[in-house]
Structure formats: C-alpha cells, structure tokens
Amino acid sequence: CMSKTVSIFNQKGGVGKTTTCVNFAAALGLKGKKTLLVDLDPQGNTTSGVGIDKTEIEKSTYDILINDEPAKDIVIQTQFKNLSLLPANMNLAGAELELAEEENRFKALKKALAPIVMDYDFIIIDCPPSLGLLSLNALTASDTLIVPLQCEYYALEGLSQLLGTVRTVKQHYNEHLELEGVLYTMYDTRLKLNSQVIDEVNQYFPNKAYKTTIPRSVKLAEAPSFGKPIFYYEKYSKP
C-alpha cells in the first residue's frame, strides 16, 4: 500500500485553506483511509478545527522540526474516524528563524515524517499562508499539492508566485512534486466574476481545476468553532 502526502497550499490567507485541510482529511478518514493531519501553521487552526485545544498542547510540529522529537510521540488521535493529528501551537512561529540556521533546512519535515509515513494511507499538511521555510518544508515532504483558490479577481495575483515556488522546490528539493488540483472555495453562484476567474485559472492550470466547487456556507464557516469537520457538525449541509 502506497502512502500519499498532500500539501494544501496557497500563500494568500483567507482562501479556505484550513477548512479544506480539515474536511478533506476527515472525508478520507470516513472513507476508511488512515489519515494524518499535519498542522504547520503557527495559528493552529487545523488543530482547533479537529477539537484539540492548542493552548493545552505540550509538544507540537515545532518539536519534530527543531528538537528532533519522534513524530510518533507527538501524534494525537482525534475523536474522528481514522484521523490523527500532528498539532501546532504558537512555538511554531519561531521555527522559521531556527530552521534558517540548519544545514538541511528544507528537509526537516520530510526527515521527521519518514519513520511514520507508511503507517498512513494519507498525510495532509496545512501550510502557513506564506512562502517561507515552513511551506517549503511541506512541499519538499509532499507528493502533490492542492491549491484552494477563492473565486475572486485578486486570487489570481499570487498564482505566478506560487507556481514559481513549486518550480523551485521541484528543481532543488523534490523533483517528484506535482500539482494535484485547484479547488475553488467560497464560490458564489450569483456572481458573474466567478466564471471569469475560472476561465483565467483554466489557462494557468489546464485540466487541473476540480469540477466540484465549495460554495459559501454558514454551516461550513461555523463548524471550526465547534472543533468539528463539517461531516460531523452538519452532515446534510448543502455541499
């Protein structure tokens, strides 16, 4: 059985990255896939999104990156089916500066995950909204990435930068990295602009955009504050 590691990455904040991460991982778990969520965002919203109190966590992804703690000792089983978590807390905010001192600064996460990769069918990484060392570590450790994209005109501004980063990672650190797909989030069917954005994205990423779009949804927006993926919070919420 092959394990697959996927980064959810967009250096723009507020595009539904964490929501995508938590719910994608929860869906895989419900489908019977053993799934590990890796929270690499110092804000720790993925951690709280699966019901873990990030202020109570003694050790986090910071410790596997900087202190060489074994990842298996830090993994938390969530209350959700087949879903485990490597949590984040505020310590992670200092990780970029500390990683900068390391010789293998881009490969710290890959090295930390290596002993446990085969324990999971999927590893899903929530990247911080930046092009810094944490995101580069995520991309170096991943087989593929999914780019959540808000359907608005400004969403396109960061795309060439994002593609440049992916190219750099492929060239120097991880030649196997592939773009899995582009996921449209916060989709409002009433807006004409959405379809313009979609046409333009299709030029950037031919055949990479998912047909499924994630509409704006109150329930989807509420679920994280209850620490639950959408399937456990409001199963019949409009998809």
Located regions from the model:
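P-loop NTP-binding core
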Residues: C1-P239
